[in-house]
Amino acid sequence: MIVVDAATGRVLSEDNPDDVSPPASMTKLMTFAVVADKISSGALTRETLVKITNEDSKMGGTQVYLDARETFSIDELLYAMMIQSANDAAHAVARVSAGSVEAFVELMNAKARELGMTHTTFRTPHGLPPSSRLKADGDLTTPRDYALLCRYLLFHTNVLQYSSVQRRDFGLNRKQGPQHMRNHNNLLGKIAGVDGLKTGYTASAGYCLSATAERHGRRVIVVIMGSFGPNGQRDLGKTRDLKAIELIERGFTALASSLPNNLATAMNAPTAAIPTVKTFESAGPTPEQSSTPRADGFTFRVAPPVKKP
């Protein structure tokens, strides 16, 4: 795990941050980064329409059940990818963005090299493990590398517009009615300042989370990988979430040491506890609730350059 000051990249806390393991659906953060670059360059727009193919619709795992007879905008698919963690949506945007999924994965790895993610290799746009290949043939990264990616996303894309949304309907015009999506990030709306970024889980990856929170103009990034419950059991991410809460508070405590006393006191004010952490990694649909976007369009922000923590 690693805790980083988002503004400077300074490491505030770490524990085996260079251990290599699968990121699971956190892979979709790099997919978002590459699509954001395409939109910023003018190669795509958020309104670009994507005709779904049979290949898109055959993705397993978490999905929005795309059908080859359907068409959706890039924007709709990005919401599905970031909120529902939809593998079929990730596959569709990757295919359209680069002409093929294989070409898109090459762009993902090029972006990783650009950001200095030296222990990262991507092989999919969604993070699903290979069904019949060795573990080494799947997506691999480290908490330190993913902190670099998170900083890039925060400073150079509008990722928070998507990652901060707790609930949203997908496919409003579908004949069968919309799918009610609920964000898998259980800290949203419960822990002060949390507005992203992405969870992940597979049997080999364990429970993963790239989280970020902002308080009084200061922001921390927390990356946790390979979390399991007691005795290595599945716990729907409860252990991961409780650890993330602890690390977020630890990060703000470290940042507060450099602030004036009044701001330090405010930053360290107690936040609402989570007596029972409800998890939605495999949960079913929930009612739609509206959410106001934080930004409009993929625009670059003025921020410090991305540096390796």
Locate predicted features.
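Active-site-adjacent loops and short helices of periplasmic peptidoglycan-processing enzymes
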Residues: 1-144, 154
